[in-house]
């Protein structure tokens, strides 16, 4: 999992507003979500990974073990049950579930880019992060 470790800055995003809309995120929060460029930092302590997301809007930290469900509060305020699986050394999949939706977030390292694909039902967004 060393390919994920370190800091990543959002460099480009496609269709994120549509995903937020599908999740029922309010218009003002969607506007903020469309303008911020978060930095994501991954660290490992044994078999536990922490993902810290920092932006001018909000800072969030989630700590998890692969394959174990945990409670998570999303940046838009939803409470979800989440699980992260390790697909390979360079690819992880996070599944978030609440009463209404299932969100699948695939993060894959390709060179110095972390390609993040966010899917809710039939709506998909791509968010690319560059290694800092």
Curated annotation (Swiss-Prot):
What family is it from? Belongs to the calycin superfamily. Fatty-acid binding protein (FABP) family.
| Keywords assigned | Cytoplasm, Lipid-binding, Transport
What effect on the protein does mutating residue 131 to Q have, as reported in its record? In variants C, D and E
The record's PROSITE patterns line, in alphabetical order, gives:
FABP (PS00214)
Q: Name one GO molecular function term.
A: lipid binding
Q: Where does (9Z)-octadecenoate bind?
A: 107, 127-129
Task: State what changing residue 32 to I does.
Answer: In variants C, D, E, F and H
Record remark: domains: Forms a beta-barrel structure that accommodates hydrophobic ligands in its interior.
Domain of life, per the record?
A: Eukaryota
Q: Key word Transmembrane helix present in the record?
A: no
Tell me the outcome of changing residue 99 to S: In variants C, D, E, F and H
Q: Altering residue 29 to T: what's the impact?
A: In variants C, D, E, F and H
Binding-site residues, (5Z,8Z,11Z,14Z)-eicosatetraenoate: 107, 127-129
Instruction: Specify whether Transport is a keyword of the entry.
Output: yes
In Swiss-Prot or TrEMBL terms, this protein is called: Fatty acid-binding protein
Q: One Pfam family, please name it.
A: Lipocalin
Q: Which GO terms describe its cellular component?
A: cytoplasm
**InterPro entries associated with the record:** Calycin, Fatty_acid-bd, ILBP, Lipocln_cytosolic_FA-bd_dom
Under SUPFAM superfamilies, the record lists: Lipocalins
Please classify the protein's predominant subcellular localization into one broad category.
cytoplasm
């Amino acid at each position: 999992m060393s390919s994920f470790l370190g800091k990543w800055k959002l460099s480009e995003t496609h269709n994120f507003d549509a995903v937020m809309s599908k999740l029922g995120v309010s218009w003002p929060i969607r506007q903020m979500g469309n303008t911020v460029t978060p930095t994501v930092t991954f660290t490992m302590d044994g078999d536990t990974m922490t993902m810290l997301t920092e932006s001018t809007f909000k800072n969030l930290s989630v700590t998890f073990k692969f394959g174990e469900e945990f409670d998570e509060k999303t940046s838009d305020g939803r409470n979800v049950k989440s699980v992260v699986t390790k697909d390979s050394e360079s690819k992880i999949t996070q599944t978030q579930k609440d009463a209404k939706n299932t969100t699948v977030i695939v993060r894959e390292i390709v060179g110095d880019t972390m390609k993040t694909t966010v899917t809710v039902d039939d709506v998909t967004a791509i968010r690319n992060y560059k290694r800092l």
